[in-house]
């Protein structure tokens, strides 16, 4: 709920001069601010500390001393992982991360605590404002430190009411520390390999451009949807299979172009150009910007972003390194192990095992107990063929159906994913639910 009226809190604080001013006999909350959203590239610019009675602002040069002192206390904070990275040589561990608790109660929360505070009626400065003004910074970090302290008991109470306190304590909080160590370790990435591949991609893009211009009969900006649309549908007269409003530009998204494959040889060249241009800008050139002085990429693992509880990755997204074709797979050569080996570990169909357990589906449980490939088993049942007769296409369809159902997909959404009629997709869903009630 957003209150009709916000409350301006006149919270007085003092600037800390001696760490012993903080009473560590009771619980202490703290909030640390960084000058960049990507905290791997940033530095600490201030800290707020609240001991239940007194509120302090801590200047950047005293933050590590204060954190060493606070190791003796029971502490609460917000975004412990960020703090652990910023305080890497302090090894600061807190007992309660407000960010994790709030996420479990509401997955739609935002990273900036000010959003939650303003929703609660507390007029707190947002991160963008804090960076502009020192007094705003001091107000922000102290207000946030006090808010973490004041709301901690309520969050714990609500977690217990929702039967999530055990998840919070025994899974999510230990995971924070694991992810912090992973982020600090980073992954080695070879700039020379990226540079070599970028140059190779640049040559191929130049050649593709010339071939495209040759078919078009003129030069134009291949990366401009407007110019490309005019070339394809006005100049070359290719069929446009979508209703176009007067004055609007032609759509040249992937679905439109893929529908024209085989109609004109320029289409395959444009699709290749697009894929290669994205590969070059996002990965071959883009990853270079994230390689720090230690030769490593330090991504940020987002523990509080997805609705499903999955981890995500940002700055850069290391979970989305392409692997569709040979050129894509070459990008992965740039990631080099420290000791000649990368270990890949993965749960075997963990989501579907959980689904089988919760739904008590006899067929799924039987398939897992027999160590069957669950997607092949489902494809066999849906298409009415033996497991040996299941094709790659059938298995791919079954996999899309299963995961689609797990995450609440509609017939329309599944149809789009599989590029089939929504009514046919709906029948797949109904057939699955009939076979695996």
Predicted features and spans:
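Conserved "right-hand" nucleotidyltransferase catalytic core of DNA-directed polymerases
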Residues: 1-61, 71-80, 134-327, 336-341, ...
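A short acidic (Asp/Glu
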Residues: 40-43, 85-89, 354
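Short, solvent-exposed amphipathic alpha-helical segments in soluble enzyme
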Residues: 44-46, 90-91, 358-361
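Short helix/loop segment immediately N-terminal to the Walker
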Residues: 160, 167, 386-394
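Amphipathic, charged-and-aliphatic alpha-helical interface segments
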Residues: 390-408
């Amino acid at each position: 709920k957003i209150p009709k009226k916000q409350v301006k809190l006149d919270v007085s604080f003092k600037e800390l001069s001696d760490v012993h001013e903080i009473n560590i006999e009771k619980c202490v909350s703290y909030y640390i601010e960084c000058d960049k959203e990507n905290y791997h590239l940033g530095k600490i610019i201030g800290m707020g500390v609240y001991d239940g009675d007194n509120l302090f602002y801590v200047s950047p040069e005293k933050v590590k001393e204060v954190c060493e002192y606070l190791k003796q206390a029971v502490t609460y904070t917000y975004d412990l992982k960020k703090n652990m990275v910023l305080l890497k040589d302090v090894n600061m561990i807190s007992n309660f991360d407000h960010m994790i608790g709030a996420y479990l109660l509401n997955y739609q929360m935002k990273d900036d605590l000010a959003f939650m505070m303003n929703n609660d009626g507390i007029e707190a400065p947002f991160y963008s404002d804090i960076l502009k003004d020192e007094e705003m910074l001091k107000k922000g970090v102290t207000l946030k430190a006090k808010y973490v302290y004041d709301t901690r008991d309520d969050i714990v109470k609500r977690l217990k009411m929702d039967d999530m306190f055990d998840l919070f304590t025994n899974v999510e909080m230990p995971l924070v520390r694991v992810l912090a160590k992973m982020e600090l370790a980073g992954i080695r990435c070879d700039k020379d390999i990226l540079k070599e591949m970028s140059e190779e991609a640049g040559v191929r893009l130049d050649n593709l451009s010339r071939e495209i211009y040759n078919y078009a009969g003129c030069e134009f900006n291949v990366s401009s949807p407007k110019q490309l649309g005019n070339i394809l549908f006005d100049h070359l007269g290719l069929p446009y299979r979508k209703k176009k409003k007067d004055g609007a530009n032609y759509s040249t998204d992937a679905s439109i172009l893929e529908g024209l494959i085989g109609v004109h040889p320029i289409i395959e060249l444009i699709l290749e150009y697009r894929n290669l241009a994205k590969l070059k800008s996002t990965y071959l050139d883009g990853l270079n910007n994230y390689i720090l002085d230690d030769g490593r990429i330090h991504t940020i693992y987002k523990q509080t972003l997805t609705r499903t509880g999955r981890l995500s990755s940002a700055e850069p997204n290391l979970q989305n390194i392409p692997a569709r074709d040979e050129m894509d797979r070459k990008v992965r050569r740039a990631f080099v192990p420290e000791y000649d080996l990368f270990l890949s570990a993965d749960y075997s169909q963990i989501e579907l095992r959980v689904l089988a357990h919760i739904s008590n589906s006899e067929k799924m449980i039987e398939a897992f107990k027999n160590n069957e490939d669950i997607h092949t088993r489902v494809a066999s049942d849906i298409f009415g063929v033996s497991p040996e007769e299941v094709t790659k296409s059938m298995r791919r369809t079954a996999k899309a159906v299963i995961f689609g159902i797990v995450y609440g997909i509609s017939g329309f959404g599944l149809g789009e994913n599989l590029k089939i009629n929504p009514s046919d997709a709906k029948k797949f869903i109904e057939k699955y639910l009939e076979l695996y009630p």
